[in-house]
Amino acid sequence: MDKSIYLSCELNAIKDVVRSDVSSASYGKMTKGAVYTLLAKMYLNAMVWNPAGGAKWQECITACNVVLGLSYIIEPSYKQSFIVKNQNSQEIIFQIVFSTSDGGNGIAQQTLHYLAAPSLGLKIGTNNGVCAMPDYVKAYDPADKRIAWSFLTGPMKNPATGAVYITAHGRPLIHTVDVTMKYGFDADGWGQTEQEDGARCFKWEFESGQNGDAENDFAIFRLADVYLMKAEALVRSDGDNAEATRLVNVIRKRAFDDASKLKTAVTLNDIYQERRFELAWEGSARQDMIRFGTFLNAIPGWKGITPAKCLIFPIPRTARDANPGLTQNPGY
């Protein structure tokens, strides 16, 4: 049996057996909400992993409806699902539970500049690593409050003096959305950027005084995603566009103060963009880009066309050595 079909069969076998409560006792555990959300994702992507089996838009809608019938809510505050004590968010369906005592969420270390930690009241070493692609941030409507909720830009200041920190290159540490690649410095041909370039991840609250990994839990699934999955399945199946539009607007109402920013009739591209804006940094982009046919596209100034083999991952050698019956995926 195909592994993806096997997985869907396994999920269907347990979907009404696992616990259905939404409580502190079920937090971090596989529940009915989590199983049905995973099924909805599989059905939404069915034409990718099993095109011979046909589209499963109605199955996706049905699975989403089960989740929508449980006691999750769209939190009035977007940040409720990303604050340090986010275990009380009723929007999170399934999460990785982190704590400072046993290691956890290390996004602050990964994204912040070496000098940014004291500016934000943190006591950690940082890597000046992850930043957002400029065109991604610029795609947001300027009135979208999720920009400020998701990306860190602007000056990083010494809290004692109020002066802007200076980077090792002698430049003010003022984070910009733009990232300017500079070539010709290294023999390997890789480009360089200035240390302050790039909007940093600001989605998970940084805890003042933090001296290790953060304890913000990471939402694998949350209800906003389910709203958008159902909306997409409705549009793809030529279903109830009014309902799809309502679902998208529930999400947009939280992000905009201006009611004119609500949609009147959503398109697939509207939903694709809404997923990009709502779910920034949450790990959904790869699936979404593959499903919408944008994953292989060139990004001018950054990368050429991605080889089609990259639509699926290679099977690690360790797995193939352990099981000679496994055949490497095409192209690897």
Predicted regions located by residue number:
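Generic detector of contiguous secondary-structure segments
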Residues: 1, 24-25, 180-183
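An aromatic- and glycine-enriched ligand-binding surface/loop that stacks and positions planar moieties
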Residues: 11, 29-181, 299
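C-terminal substrate/ligand-recognition segments
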Residues: 153-251
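Acidic, serine/threonine- and proline-rich low-complexity regulatory regions
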Residues: 18-28, 76-79, 208-216
